Structures are given as C-alpha cells and as structure tokens.
Design a protein with these regions (language model features):
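Charged, amphipathic alpha-helical segments and their flanking helix caps
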Residues: 1-49, 54-154
C-alpha cells in the first residue's frame, strides 16, 4: 500500500495474524524450552480435511472492536483463533496439551507483539490476553484438535 494514502486508523488484522503465525513457526521447532515441533503454521483457518501434516497450527482473525478515548485516540481489540491439530497413537491428549502450552508460552513471551503494517512501518501491540483454551478431550483419537482464543489490543 502506498504510504501517502494510508489511513491513520486502519485495521491491521492481516499483519497481526501474520506476525503471530511467524512467531509460532520460528519458535516451535522442538528446541528447549518448547516440547513441540510443528510441521506447518498458516495465517488462515482451513477445513479439517485440508490438514495433512501434524502437528499443524492455523491462525485466523475474528471479530474486531474499537474503544474510543479522548483526543481522537482509539484502541482496537482483535480476537484471534489459534487452532492446533495433532496426531498421536500413544497419548493424543498429552500431545495436544504440550502443543497448547507451547502456543500459550510463545504468545506470552511475545507480548507486546511487533509487526509490520501495510505501509511497511513497524508497529507494536499494546496487550495480548489469552481468553480461553479448549480441546476435543480425545474424542477424535488418534487425532486431536484444540483452540486458543486470544484478544490483541493495539
């Protein structure tokens, strides 16, 4: 996007999702302190039948709201879904819990999150809040799916 036509108050959904996906992919390579090594991290959600490599992570943007402050300042709140897929013939619940713990650690360690907006300018988020962590509790064994719902304030 041409910087001369950039808006002062624009959404940064795509940039934030991309930065989260990049951090997860770079961090979750099996080296300490992380226990998971992911095969793929994508900056979009896919249908279940499209997942072929495990463990896999997909990051997608959801609802975005605004909070208006004085002097024309506004905060944006972006809800992010981090969906995790595992395949384990021994203990799928443990494999999924380890991956979800690693995802949570990456999100917390990168708060505030630095990202590049559509004009190429470096930006930072104000706050990352993990709202919920949910799993299928082994119903799909040997496959497992879990979600971390995050709110990004920027």
């Amino acid at each position: 996007m041409d910087a001369s036509i950039a808006r002062a108050h624009s959404t940064r959904r795509r940039s934030i999702v991309g930065a989260i996906a990049s951090q997860l992919y770079q961090s979750l390579n099996g080296t300490a302190p992380f226990r998971s090594s992911v095969q793929s991290v994508e900056p979009r959600l896919r249908f279940w039948d499209e997942v072929t490599d495990f463990p896999a992570i997909q990051v997608g943007a959801g609802q975005e709201t605004r909070e208006y402050e004085g002097g024309g300042f506004r905060f944006r709140f972006l809800r992010i879904t981090v969906r995790c897929y595992v395949h384990d013939n021994d203990d799928v619940i443990l494999a999924l819990e380890e991956l979800l713990e690693d995802v949570e650690t990456v999100l917390e360690d990168n708060d505030p999150l630095t990202y590049t907006d559509s004009t190429g300018k470096s930006q930072s988020t104000a706050k990352t809040t993990i709202l919920s962590v949910d799993t299928d509790e082994g119903v799909l064994e040997p496959l497992g799916v879990g979600e971390v719902i995050v709110e990004i304030q920027y």
